Amino acid sequence: MFDKLFEPIQIRGMELRNRVVMSAMGTHESAESEDGKSVTDKLIAYHVARAKGGNGLNTVEVTSVDAPSAPFGFLSIAEDKYIAGFKKLNDAVHEAGGKTCIQLWQGGLAVASDQMAQILVPNDLPLSPQY
């Protein structure tokens, strides 16, 4: 009944070993990094374990695309300095037989938990006092 689930699939030239896809889950492991926004060895181990367990594709958690609004404890790819960490994660998951993708994110009001992050929203209406 679920034979197709475990068959390889090609998506625009990339082959996944099966159709098991892990959706993005917030681990907040980046909070343990020096700047609070980088890939950590613990995050890499988390994704490698899931690839070894059989996932064809792991979606890495929300990843900020804008430096001023990247809150502490969330991954960022807003600056080139983050590329090496993502490459290390990607290479490790490939070595374990899986693939990765990331969920790009501009946090909007969700970044309000970090007083240092700039809140960006798509309008010029005043924010409520809680923000």
Question: Where are each of the predicted segments found?
Answer:
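N-terminal amphipathic alpha-helix/helix-capping segment at the start of soluble metabolic enzymes
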Residues: 1-24, 93
